From Swiss-Prot:
Gene3D superfamilies: 3.40.50.12360. This is HDA1 complex subunit 3. It holds the Pfam family HDA2-3. One of its GO terms (cellular component) is nucleus. Belongs to the HDA2/3 family. HDA3 subfamily. It comes from Saccharomyces cerevisiae (strain ATCC 204508 / S288c). Present with 1100 molecules/cell in log phase SD medium. The gene is HDA3. Heterodimer with HDA2. Component of the HDA1 histone deacetylase complex composed of at least one HDA1 homodimer and one HDA2/HDA3 heterodimer. Interacts with HDA1 and HDA3.
């Protein structure tokens, strides 16, 4: 047994009990598992905030910005921060491996993301059981990285988006199956679930998973009973502590996710908490150093309470807090645990560190100290090899006679001016100009502020007077109520005494004999008869009113009947007039029809005569044409040549 090796190894911290952790006994089925963040993730988050520095200030300090531009910038910052909180390769792909199926990729992915490291430890525990685990995350590259991480575990992977980084899946006999679903656009018709058993756990990798959606509810209730404690699969949300995911998860329960308050609180918390990204509380660190073995009992029986505390609450920060945080430079260390740093810097064997032992024990303290520049340690203090006595240039040259008692005005008294001194002088002068301008602005606004002060002082006095008036009225009301209460008590006591007197009088009357008892019965009967009379009078009054109402209704009905009869008579008269008009028009139309028929007969006769005449003329024309065809035409002989000569000879004589 190598005792030296055992003593040199890092001691395993003990896990504190549940009471110290602040466990609330949560059995809701929706749990959060905080994760750490790598140094690369922290630096990227700080750079994202720095890139949006001006937009953040404009968003929190002013109200006249372009809403679409600034709001889109804030949403882009939150989206990029959420991507980095999951894995830095989702935003920066410079160091992205060319192939995601090589053997060293899972360890490399877990090293650069605290969330992937915790997920790997959780899957290492789950793979020891015969379980069906569902993981939901963003579609695209997130699922590719998640599949590449799971290739390093002994699990069977089933992906439901139609893609895979591995073209061929080898057959294996792993007992644990991990199902990968995208948080957007799950199509169970195209990609049905390939599991005959229910899901034992649903892991949400990022904040895009909405467990109230219909598809996610289907996964939670898949193959489960509709009633009972186990009708839903337990949900485990992996959330990087103090990151944008933590802010969204916490403030999403307090505000509407589309409201301005939600965006303001999430953005402010992201900016202010960037120096505490992924920093686990000391009570939780032993759980993660032991690879989450603390959760084995819950994994075996998910019905027991969640063994970790609920989500840590966050403050609602103001714009002043955001501005102060933006002016503060953030420094990150590789590890927040000094014991972890000490053991990582020491060698595994005792004989190897030797003289560096003292230096290695103070590594954490050295990292916190910022190394001063050359100008602040040497030249500005006159500490260089040509000036062993550390005398200033005034004493060495005798040229300048300025007062050198203060180190602040060194650049005014020394004979040496460096580039850094010139730059610092320029910055100081610029700051002085800005301060002078601000002072002038404040001087200009002094009268306005005095007016504001006077106005608010007057308002304050008015409010104080109103308050005093209301207070005085309240006191008077209290006194009056007290007096009324005293009077009521006196009257109550008087009523009690009168009731007692009445009882005594009744007793004395009963003791006097039957006559008084008969009088009492008669008095009671008289009282009852009086009540019945009053009741009958009320009934008669109500009947009279009802009778009047019915008479009015009958009168209205009679008037309505009379009006209807008059309208009916008018309509009958109008109908008779229309019928007579129609008869006259029918008679006129019959007369015109007879005349038209006579004209038509006359025209038909004339048309027949014309047709006969036409036929006769056609017959004559045909005879004439036949005669013309039979007629012989005589032929005339002409001498063409002689005729032409004679005509030519006659021309000169005629001329």
């Amino acid at each position: 047994m190598d005792l030296l090796r055992i003593l040199d190894t890092k001691p395993i911290p003990t896990i504190v009990d549940a009471t110290t952790l602040g466990i609330s006994g949560n059995t809701s089925g929706d749990y959060w598992l905080p994760t750490t963040m790598s140094l690369y993730q922290k630096e990227l988050t700080d750079q994202i905030v720095s890139l949006h520095y001006s937009d953040i200030l404009r968003y929190f300090e002013t109200s006249h910005y372009k809403e679409d531009v600034i709001l889109e910038s804030m949403k882009t910052m939150c989206l990029n921060g959420s991507l980095v909180a999951t894995h830095p390769y989702l935003l920066i792909d410079h160091y992205m491996p060319k192939s995601l199926i090589t053997r060293d990729v899972p360890a490399h992915l877990a090293e650069n993301s605290g969330k992937f490291s915790v997920l790997r430890d959780l899957i290492n525990l789950v793979q020891e059981y015969e379980t069906e685990t569902a993981i939901v995350c963003r579609p695209g590259r997130t699922m590719d990285l998640l599949e590449a991480l799971l290739l390093g575990n002994k699990v069977h992977i089933k992906r439901y988006d139609g893609h895979s980084i591995k073209s061929k899946q080898k057959a294996n006999d792993f007992s644990c199956t991990v199902h990968l679903f995208s948080s957007e656009g799950i199509n169970f018709t195209k990609y049905p679930i390939k599991s005959k058993a229910r899901f034992d756990m649903l892991i949400c990798l990022d904040t895009t998973v909405d467990t109230s959606q219909k598809d996610i509810q289907y996964l939670l209730q898949y193959k489960r009973e509709r009633k009972g404690l186990e009708r839903y699969a337990p949900i485990v949300r992996l959330v990087a502590i103090n990151s944008i995911d933590h802010c969204r998860l916490f403030f999403g329960k307090k505000f509407d996710k589309n409201s301005r308050e939600y965006l303001e609180n999430v953005t402010a918390a992201m900016v202010i908490l960037r120096d505490r990204l992924g920093t686990l509380p000391p009570d939780l660190r032993p759980i993660y150093s032991q690879k989450l073995h603390y959760l084995v009992e819950w994994l075996e029986n998910p019905t027991v309470p969640w063994p970790l505390p609920d989500i840590y609450p966050l403050k609602q920060y103001t714009s002043m807090d955001v501005e102060r945080s933006l002016l503060t430079e953030v420094h990150f260390k590789k590890s927040d645990d000094q014991l972890e740093d000490a053991f990582s810097n020491c060698s595994k064997k005792r004989g190897r560190h030797g003289a560096n032992k003292a230096a290695s024990s103070t590594v954490a303290g050295i990292e916190d100290n910022i190394t001063p520049s050359f100008y602040s340690t040497k030249r500005l203090k006159n500490d260089y090899y040509t000036n062993p006595l550390k005398q200033d240039m005034t004493q060495l040259t005798g040229i300048t006679t300025a007062d050198n008692s203060s180190n602040v005005n060194y650049h005014l008294s020394s004979g040496i001016i460096t580039h850094k001194l010139i730059q610092s002088m320029g910055e100081v002068y610029m700051d002085i100009c800005v301060q002078k301008q601000e002072l002038d602005d404040y001087s200009c606004l002094d009268d306005l502020q005095n007016d504001h002060l006077k106005f608010f002082s007057n308002e304050d006095e008015k409010i104080i007077k109103e308050y005093e008036t209301v207070l005085r009225t309240n006191n008077e009301n209290l006194n009056r109520s007290h007096e009324l209460e005293v009077e009521n008590n006196l009257k109550f006591s008087q009523i009690e005494t009168l009731e007692k007197d009445i009882e005594t009088l009744k007793g004395s009357l009963m003791a006097q004999g039957e006559t008084l008892s008969k009088l009492k019965d008669a008095f009671v009967k008289t009282d009852n008869v009086q009540d019945e009379i009053e009741k009958e009078e009320r009934v008669s009054v109500s009947r009279d009113t009802e009778k009047k109402y019915m008479e009015q209704e009958i009168k209205r009905a009679v008037d309505a009947i009379r009006e209807n009869e008059e309208e009916t008579h008018k309509l009958n008269e109008k109908q008779n007039g229309l019928e007579s008009e129609l008869k006259l028009k029918f008679e006129k139309s019959e007369i015109s029809t007879k005349e038209l028929n006579e004209k038509i007969g006359f025209l038909k006769k004339e048309l027949k005569l014309e047709n006969d005449l036409n036929e006769e003329l056609v017959g004559q024309l045909s005879k004439t044409m036949d005669n013309l065809e039979n007629l012989t035409i005589p032929r005339v002989r002409t001498q063409n040549g002689n005729t032409k000569k004679k005509s030519r000879a006659k021309k000169p004589g005629n001329v």
